[in-house]
Amino acid sequence: MNFQTISINLTEGKILVFETGKIARQANGAVLVRSGETCVFASACAVDLDDKVDFLPLRVDYQEKFSSTGKTLGGFIKREGRPSEKEILVSRLIDRSLRPSFPYRLMQDVQVLSYVWSYDGQVLPDPLAICAASAALAISDIPQSNIVAGVRIGCIDNQWVINPTKTELASSTLDLVLAGTENAILMIEGHCDFFTEEQVLDAIEFGHKHIVTICKRLQLWQEEVGKSKNLSAVYPLPAEVLTAVKECAQDKFTELFNIKDKKVHAATAHEIEENILEKLQREDDDLFSSFNIKAACKTLKSDTMRALIRDREIRADGRSLTTVRPITIETSYLPRTHGSCLFTRGETQTLAVCTLGSEAMAQRYEDLNGEGLSKFYLQYFFPPFSVGEVGRIGSPGRREIGHGKLAEKALSHALPDSATFPYTIRIESNITESNGSSSMASVCGGCLALMDAGVPISSPIAGIAMGLILDDQGAIILSDISGLEDHLGDMDFKIAGSGKGITAFQMDIKVEGITPAIMKKALSQAKQGCNDILNIMNEALSAPKADLSQYAPRIETMQIKPTKIASVIGPGGKQIRQIIEETGVQIDVNDLGVVSISASSASAINKAKEIIEGLVGEVEVGKTYRGRVTSVVAFGAFVEVLPGKEGLCHISECSRQRIENISDVVKEGDIIDVKLLSINEKGQLKLSHKATLE
């Protein structure tokens, strides 16, 4: 293929340039996207599977090259290795945007790789990566039902901003990443500062207009330079297999949905499937293979659940369409933690724990924008026992990182600022049972743990996951979906917020056709569900506790001049280590001169503050100081009034009586009171002990 390029103008100064035919020409598809001086590359490759599977083995990896900003990784290892949390989150954004666009039962191993090769510090690469990956698939021979595009939306001074720059995003009250096709929304991820449902919908509609622009142009580009799609690896479910399974077990699948218990339901479903396989599976028959029969069972199970919901408005666990599962709450569940809550909603449960600490406890990270730290972070743990399984224990998976970050963003908008509450806050959400909506349980449990710890949040935050049944007869919205409804339904739309508005949201779908009208209904129904949950939370804990836990450290901050930071730290950190050893406190100093002092007792903090004030204090004429005599000479004594600041107390100012020998009055090492009389043009201090005796 020869070099090909197109430009798409989103708005003034924000242009996307797509290039192909120059780099990675052996890949099925490869595209470089430029915007400003940020360049993101994506490739798409696929190979046929040796064994058929009932899922799409799509692998998406996104990597930010430090060379893109003219940097090299710190430390001994200079090569990019294990993906960072941010890279994992962007990989998930790309994956969730693309996955719905692949045809059902595509038997190919598909890999999409995306690299940031140039970053100008302003044009953010996330939406470019979605567009680059979609364009690479579009011009490849890998089957794809529709072209996808992604954009980011910000809100500055109540005005929507398309693909905001890093500077613009810093002042935005909304951070929304949106992906979709020309006709539908496929993926949503964002957080905002207590937006109304109408504001969220307006932002989505604004973003989708730009998605349509990109998709239409990419469609023309695909027709110009794209390869013919290879459909040989798509295996539709044979109608005769589905018919045979229906005749064999329709009644049994209907009876299955009378079972409410998750484990009993799963065991019964497995037994039904095994009986069907025994009856219908034929050796050396590709049509009635185990692969096709199991797929038909899943389809029939889904169809049965949908029919029951549509015809009877009754769900698998017996709830109505809008009912939230029963909730129980126990705060202060763990006695020695700073704050804790056991939150149970149906068969989903989290033990949330809040830990308070100094800045030393903050989460440090390094990315293309440099080094940074987070003073609030939520970590989500999903052990295998939560679903009654045996599995690996180790570093967190992509799902755990994604769920934790969503809950973290939801709660972050209710937190006090550092000046009001100078603590680093860590929440861990330990999922101990799971049957759907564990990330939203983490929001509820995490909020209650914050309140139990005495963190003065602005308002309680709750979360709920909404589901969807979509067919030719219309759309049905489900509140607080279970794991089964997530698995067999068409949408997982998570919304978190308070009575003031929405703080975070995330949507994944399995079908196209999510319209603004459906989203409006889902948001309205979610608001009612969140309010119901907030009322229950309010009964358990109506406000943050007035006092911190007795086991939490005490933290106070003080402001010093940035020019005085060196005085506190000392050469090689000698001075600050001395203060820590002497008082037993923990001290953190930032570049702005904010000193954070933490300790288990107020007396230790006060002692450290006194030392620091002495180190950075400025002497004042007319003020009395208690100082140490550093040396004695014939004409007087030199007295240190503040660390590193000493002045001369002349022999005539040492006593109210005339003295011949100053050693008769003071000796080196004595502690005496002196008054600062004046400071000459050279900065020398004139002191008087006599003035303190009057």
UniProtKB/Swiss-Prot annotation:
Localization annotation: Cytoplasm
UniProt cross-references to Pfam families, sorted A to Z: KH_1, PNPase, RNase_PH, RNase_PH_C, S1
Cofactor field: Mg(2+)
GO cellular component, one term: cytosol
Keyword Cell membrane listed: no
E.C. number: 2.7.7.8
Database matches in InterPro entries: ExoRNase_PH_dom1, ExoRNase_PH_dom2, ExoRNase_PH_dom2_sf, KH_dom, KH_dom_type_1, KH_dom_type_1_sf, NA-bd_OB-fold, PNPase
Enzyme category, top tier: transferase
The organism's place on the tree of life at top rank: Bacteria
GO biological process, one term: mRNA catabolic process
KH domain sequence ranges: 553-612
Signal sequence, start to end: none
Catalytic activity: RNA(n+1) + phosphate = RNA(n) + a ribonucleoside 5'-diphosphate
Keywords noted in UniProt: Cytoplasm, Magnesium, Metal-binding, Nucleotidyltransferase, RNA-binding, Transferase
GO molecular function: 3'-5'-RNA exonuclease activity; magnesium ion binding; polyribonucleotide nucleotidyltransferase activity; RNA binding
Residue span, S1 motif domain: 622-690
PANTHER family: POLYRIBONUCLEOTIDE NUCLEOTIDYLTRANSFERASE, POLYRIBONUCLEOTIDE NUCLEOTIDYLTRANSFERASE 1, MITOCHONDRIAL
Function statement: Involved in mRNA degradation. Catalyzes the phosphorolysis of single-stranded polyribonucleotides processively in the 3'- to 5'-direction.
Family classification: Belongs to the polyribonucleotide nucleotidyltransferase family.
Protein name as catalogued: Polyribonucleotide nucleotidyltransferase
